[in-house]
């Protein structure tokens, strides 16, 4: 097993200690979240009771294969806790998420939860967000106009950089909701809130990967052990 996977498992194992029997749980998407699902499934086999809302079809499939009971936000609109990964996390626990393409559902599930705990390895911790390209989920209609509006909004925020339509097997990547994703390489984002507001003002933008004020804590695994970052 490589070192990167060991760190993901370590963070996932620590997060599992926050999950109590009978909880309604939001379950994230991505490689670290999948390690959490595998550990959770082992506890479920031993009689531990949880019911989960997955943030993607991929996560739902893994949960079903491993025997983790699932529900929906229609049936269970209020969740106790969400456990999810992140592409970047800063000292204020603002995040960039969406590398796996599930940012819309991830944000809906996190917002429906009493709290959100992020699991990640040390490489995801940054002083300022933006090293990882920011995923922006957009409606397929009017793509060119939407990209132009994103560029203009970024300039007003003092940002610029390539906007790339995400591809999969040579065709535009489609989210579970049937939307495109534009990956914005703005570089450092010193004011995530201002950029967030500017992006949401664009009609063609469905969602973006800036998660601000949602994470309560981040469990960070490094070669020297586990540390927990808490939002001030």
UniProtKB/Swiss-Prot annotation:
Pathway field of the UniProt record reads: Carbohydrate degradation; pentose phosphate pathway; D-ribose 5-phosphate from D-ribulose 5-phosphate (non-oxidative stage): step 1/1
Residues forming the catalytic site: 106 (proton acceptor)
User: Listed GO molecular functions?
Assistant: ribose-5-phosphate isomerase activity
What domain of life?
Bacteria
User: Where substrate is bound, by residue?
Assistant: 29-32, 84-87, 97-100, 124
Q: One GO BP annotation here?
A: pentose-phosphate shunt, non-oxidative branch
Keyword list (alphabetical) reads:
Isomerase
Q: Which Gene3D superfamilies match?
A: 3.30.70.260, 3.40.50.1360
* EC number, UniProt record: 5.3.1.6
Q: Which reaction does it catalyse?
A: aldehydo-D-ribose 5-phosphate = D-ribulose 5-phosphate
Which InterPro entries does the UniProt entry name for this protein?
Answer: NagB/RpiA_transferase-like (IPR037171), Ribose-5P_isomerase (IPR050262), Ribose5P_isomerase_typA_subgr (IPR020672), Ribose5P_isomerase_type_A (IPR004788)
Q: Name one Pfam family in it.
A: Rib_5-P_isom_A
Family that this chain belongs to: Belongs to the ribose 5-phosphate isomerase family.
Main role? Answer: Catalyzes the reversible conversion of ribose-5-phosphate to ribulose 5-phosphate.
Q: Which NCBIfam families match?
A: PRK00702.1, rpiA
**Subunit composition and interactions:** Homodimer.
The protein's name in its UniProt record:
Ribose-5-phosphate isomerase A
Species, as recorded: Brucella suis biovar 1 (strain 1330)
């Amino acid at each position: 097993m490589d070192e990167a996977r060991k760190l993901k498992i370590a963070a996932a194992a620590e997060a599992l200690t926050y999950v109590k029997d009978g909880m309604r749980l939001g379950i994230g998407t991505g490689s670290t979240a999948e390690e959490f699902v595998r550990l959770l499934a082992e506890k479920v086999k031993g009689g531990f009771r949880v019911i989960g809302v997955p943030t993607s079809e991929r996560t739902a499939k893994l949960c079903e294969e491993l025997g983790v009971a699932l529900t929906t936000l229609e049936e269970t609109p209020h969740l106790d806790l969400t456990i999810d990964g992140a592409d970047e996390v800063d000292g204020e626990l603002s995040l960039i998420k969406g590398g796996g393409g599930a940012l819309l559902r991830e944000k809906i599930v996190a917002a429906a939860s009493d709290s959100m705990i992020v699991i990640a390895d040390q490489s995801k911790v940054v002083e300022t967000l933006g090293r990882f390209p920011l995923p922006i989920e957009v409606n397929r209609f009017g793509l060119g106009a939407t990209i132009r509006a994103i560029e203009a909004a970024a300039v007003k925020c003092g940002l610029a950089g390539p906007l790339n339509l995400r591809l999969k097997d040579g065709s535009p990547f489609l989210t579970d909701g049937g939307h495109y994703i534009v990956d914005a390489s703005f570089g450092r984002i010193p004011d995530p809130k201002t950029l967030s507001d500017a992006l949401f003002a664009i009609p063609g933008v469905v969602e973006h990967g800036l998660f601000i004020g949602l994470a309560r804590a981040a469990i960070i695994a490094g070669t020297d052990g586990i540390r927990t970052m808490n939002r001030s």
